[in-house]
Amino acid sequence: MNFCRILLKPLKKNEALSGYSAEGLHYLTDNKHFNPELPFSRQEFITVKPQKQQGMSISGFQPKLQLIIKDEHFDSVNQQGNYILKPSPEEYPFLAENEHATMRIMKELGFDVPENGLVSFAGEQNHKEFAFVITRFDRDKQQKPMHQEQLDGAMNIRDKYGKIGADNEQYVSYEQIAKFILQHTENHLAQQREIFRRIIYAYLLGNNDLHLRNFSFIYPKNSHPKLAPIYDFVSVSPYPEIFNSTLLALPLLAREEGNATLAKGFNTQYGEYIGDDFVEFGENIGLNKNVIIQKLIPEIIQEKEKVEQIYSQSFMPQPHIDCVLKTYRKRLALLNLLNEPEL
């Protein structure tokens, strides 16, 4: 069965050749007749477009381009683009397909996710290489720029992994981040729940690179600061040089900062984060323990079929899908471990 390269839903017979559904094209571009093929080749992107590229990746530099819609197709611009184009870096093949699938999952799970999809370079007939394209979230309804501030800047922390001392230890945890966000935006149950679920899904899906710059504040005109939508959310499970280096980009709990102490899960037979640690995290950011145990964690466990289905329908290569789902299933089982005895 063929699936839409935007929505990952089954295509109708008359849509199979293009690879896009009318619904998907309208979702991404407000035009169901839009031509999603890029007007330049991968080689042109590498050799001609570098002066327009900007950005960073899960490790170092990931070329990006700003895009606009022109004559029912995408075109590149130096600035003021409405979309960002992100091909897979050579050192991380199929990262575009990975980000698309993972962001689609986050969208289907109820997170705020900008419109996104996969597009192909021009002139590729036998083997299409996809690039990830996403709507810019720092634009208002009139496409005017809104001020965006990444969390390392907002917190005045110079290192995105929280290594601010001479000892190379991490002194910024997800708990500290969550409290800072809640202090400077809306501190209510829905926001607490959103942050709680965001961090848990980073763990479950193998997003071991969710650092400070992957959280941002948006400052709408004449309004309070808001937490930016999900962005740069990928699974690094298929890339062992990153995945095997750490369980999460930052410590989960404030008491782990500076390597002062270990979360409970590391003192059990499992030797990594378990459900008890996420219960502690949730309580520390203001959630009720009973709500976490009786509602939030069971809801996440019940979302298993949806997660597996979307990855299975994605354009990631099968070995990458298998790798991500192996991590997901293992960590989902660990999340279900509560009141686990310590060694």
From Swiss-Prot:
Which residues carry out catalysis?
Answer: D209 (proton acceptor)
**Pfam families in UniProt:** HipA_C (PF07804)
Give GO terms: molecular function aspect only. protein serine/threonine kinase activity
Per UniProt, the keywords (alphabetical) are:
Kinase, Transferase
Cellular component GO terms, alphabetically? cytosol
Q: Which InterPro entries match?
A: HipA-like_C, HipA_Ser/Thr_kinase
Enzyme Commission no: 2.-.-.-
Regions crossing the membrane: none
Coiled-coil annotation: which residues?
none
- EC class (word): transferase
- Family to which the UniProt record says this protein belongs: Belongs to the HipA Ser/Thr kinase family.
Q: What is this protein called?
A: Putative kinase HI_0665
